Swiss-Prot record:
Cofactor(s) needed for function: Mg(2+); Mn(2+)
EC numbers for this chain: 1.1.1.267
Coiled coil: none
Species for this entry: Aliivibrio fischeri (strain MJ11)
Catalytic activity entry: 2-C-methyl-D-erythritol 4-phosphate + NADP(+) = 1-deoxy-D-xylulose 5-phosphate + NADPH + H(+)
Segments traversing the membrane: none
Keywords associated with the record: Isoprene biosynthesis, Manganese, Metal-binding, NADP, Oxidoreductase
Protein name: 1-deoxy-D-xylulose 5-phosphate reductoisomerase
Protein residues bound to Mn(2+): 150, 152, 231
Purpose of the protein: Catalyzes the NADPH-dependent rearrangement and reduction of 1-deoxy-D-xylulose-5-phosphate (DXP) to 2-C-methyl-D-erythritol 4-phosphate (MEP).
Length: 400
């Protein structure tokens, strides 16, 4: 039986992970749950799952949860802050960690799980975007096991031979006959909207994704296609891919989750309904298969598959991310930080939808001008750069 810590338990990935665990209760035990500040949701989860350990991102949230758990006679040990989340990521009695905390906040807890040699189910793409080679080196150094949860990376993973699956970040695609990786994306809710109308997009419009059920931040990232840009950077590190080996294709139906093209002309694609329980179940049970609770794909109802080249005038954030990928670690760390601040400002109605790309571009230029030669050889140096980029972004937001 696999024993799990779920980081980001109250979010959409956490919910889907618990759904898969419930479908296969004889194979998975929930030992620890970690979350941000959603005390009410965490209380519900504790009442249902009875974890031994819980961690909340802030002390007030942890204190409030302790009080509620005591009132319900639940004996879970409650930790707080980044240290608390890192602690439950490296518990001796846990062998598998679902890393699903959104954004840069997930980096240190995920790295703690790596250093404790856990099986890492990586749903937090920002961890790799922010730390790149440092993360890949740590996985090898500490003997951790890395399995990608993002639907696209999981699809690519499933289309690659086992010798690559067990050597992520250090594989040689060409040696295995791979000519290219085709990263698919839906294009978000505004793929057919006139570009001149994008300035008027509201947060409510942006978070209404046509295919996937996701949290607000990732929904906005999907609308700008920054999400695909971050996934592009993550794919570069996970699969040790060159610029020539990575391509982005818009596929509005979200049925083909990504593809791998081989030298002999073969193309392997992973397909399924747009439901995160499928890639989550794949990683939770790897190399076996378990019931994810997902309806089988009915090809007679799919109708057709459409593929479109991305239009960078519509999706400037995607172009920024692809460019940043080859400028260096300072660029991807800085861009990710800027985007988190810009999306938060948009969701708070402080800036327009189209300002997100402008702020990201301004911060990327500033980071590249000031930190191009900075040696990013530790988590501390990456976090310092992340903070500085957020400061630049906040300054740009205040000028809008």
């Amino acid at each position: 039986m696999r024993k799990l810590t779920i980081l980001g338990a109250t979010g959409s990935i956490g919910s889907s992970t618990l759904s898969v665990a419930q479908q296969n209760s004889d194979q998975f035990e929930i030992v620890a749950l970690g979350a941000g500040t959603n005390v009410d949701k965490m209380l519900e989860l504790c009442l249902e799952w009875k974890p031994k350990y819980v961690a909340m991102a802030t002390q007030p949230a942890a204190d409030a949860l302790k009080e509620l758990l005591s009132a319900h006679a639940i004996n879970a040990e409650v930790f707080s802050g980044e240290d608390g989340l890192c602690h439950i990521a490296q518990l001796d009695e846990v062998d598998t960690v679902m890393a699903a905390i959104v954004g840069a906040a997930g980096l240190l807890p995920t790295m703690s799980a790596v250093k404790a040699s856990k099986r890492i189910l990586l749903a937090n793409k920002e961890a790799l975007v922010m730390s790149g080679q440092l993360f890949i080196d740590a996985v090898e150094k500490y003997g951790a096991e890395l399995l990608p949860v993002d639907s696209e990376h999981n699809a690519i993973f499933q289309c690659l031979p086992q010798s690559i699956q067990t050597n992520l970040g250090r594989c040689d695609l060409e040696e295995h006959g791979v000519s290219s990786i085709l990263l698919t994306g839906s294009g978000g809710p505004f793929r057919y909207t006139d570009v001149s109308e994008l300035e008027a997009v509201t947060p409510e419009m942006a978070i209404a994704h046509p295919n996937w059920s996701m949290g607000p931040k990732i929904s906005v990232d999907s609308a700008t296609m920054m999400n695909k840009g971050l996934e592009y950077i993550e794919a570069r590190w996970l699969f040790n891919a060159s610029k020539e080996q990575l391509k982005v294709v818009i596929h509005p139906q979200s049925v083909i989750h990504s593809m791998v093209q081989y030298k002999d002309g073969s193309v392997l694609a992973q397909m399924g309904l747009p439901d995160m329980r499928t890639p989550i179940a794949c990683t939770m049970s790897y190399p076996k298969r378990v019931n994810a609770g997902v309806e089988p794909l009915d090809f007679t109802k799919v109708g057709e598959f459409t593929f479109i080249a991305p239009d960078f005038s519509r999706y400037p954030c995607l172009k920024l991310a692809i460019d940043a990928c080859y400028l260096g670690q300072h660029a991807t760390t800085g861009l990710n930080a800027a985007n988190e601040q810009a999306v938060a400002a948009f969701l708070a109605n402080k800036i327009k939808f189209t300002d997100i790309a402008r702020i990201n571009e301004a911060v990327l230029h500033k980071v590249c001008a000031n930190f191009q030669n900075l040696e990013l050889d530790s988590l501390e140096s990456l976090i310092d750069l992340d903070r500085m980029a957020r400061r630049y972004a906040d300054e740009a937001i205040n000028k809008v």
